[in-house]
From Swiss-Prot:
<comment type="function">
    <text>NDH-1 shuttles electrons from NADH, via FMN and iron-sulfur (Fe-S) centers, to quinones in the respiratory chain. The immediate electron acceptor for the enzyme in this species is believed to be ubiquinone. Couples the redox reaction to proton translocation (for every two electrons transferred, four hydrogen ions are translocated across the cytoplasmic membrane), and thus conserves the redox energy in a proton gradient.</text>
</comment>
<feature type="transmembrane region" description="Helical">
    <location>
        <begin position="28"/>
        <end position="48"/>
    </location>
</feature>
<dbReference type="GO" id="GO:0008137">
    <property type="term" value="F:NADH dehydrogenase (ubiquinone) activity"/>
</dbReference>
<dbReference type="Pfam" id="PF00499">
    <property type="entry name" value="Oxidored_q3"/>
</dbReference>
<dbReference type="InterPro" id="IPR042106">
    <property type="entry name" value="Nuo/plastoQ_OxRdtase_6_NuoJ"/>
</dbReference>
<protein>
    <recommendedName>
        <fullName>NADH-quinone oxidoreductase subunit J</fullName>
        <ecNumber>7.1.1.-</ecNumber>
    </recommendedName>
</protein>
<dbReference type="InterPro" id="IPR001457">
    <property type="entry name" value="NADH_UbQ/plastoQ_OxRdtase_su6"/>
</dbReference>
<keyword id="KW-0520">NAD</keyword>
<keyword id="KW-0830">Ubiquinone</keyword>
<keyword id="KW-0812">Transmembrane</keyword>
<keyword id="KW-0997">Cell inner membrane</keyword>
<keyword id="KW-1133">Transmembrane helix</keyword>
<dbReference type="GO" id="GO:0005886">
    <property type="term" value="C:plasma membrane"/>
</dbReference>
<feature type="transmembrane region" description="Helical">
    <location>
        <begin position="1"/>
        <end position="21"/>
    </location>
</feature>
<keyword id="KW-0874">Quinone</keyword>
<keyword id="KW-1003">Cell membrane</keyword>
<keyword id="KW-0472">Membrane</keyword>
Amino acid sequence: MEFAFYFAAGVAVLATLRVITNSNPVHALLYLIISLLAISMTFFSLGAPFAGALEIIVYAGAIMVLFVFVVMMLNLGPAVVEQERKWLTPGIWVGPSALALVLLVELLVVLARTPSGAGIGHTTVDAKAVGISLYGPYLLVVELASMLLLAALVAAYHLGRQDAKQ
């Protein structure tokens, strides 16, 4: 089980480095999705299936769709759109697809080896404990994170509009 944790953490670090070093926002989004899925796998291997499922649903699902809309709102122009069409060849999908396939195999191995769902810590964190923590001592942190995401969305929209005016 420790191998699954370290392997998922390594994939998360590798994918996050590709997000940071990639100059194309669409390609960076692909690697960000893989990074979020790898972080979800670390939660699963630590025995927190609820946190892993939330990571997939909330971050890899909803927030990534929001990021795609923000990239689309930036309206990069016809030259960039044509360049995007050239970049979106099947070869671009090899890296994220390989990392996603490795994570899928790891998920199947983790689920097959632990029938109880307990991981490295040998305890399972259920939804009730997460809810009590989120709406208890960590309520301010959750609200600050939501405000930070909203500010990032407004800033991206504003920066996109400033470029369009010039």
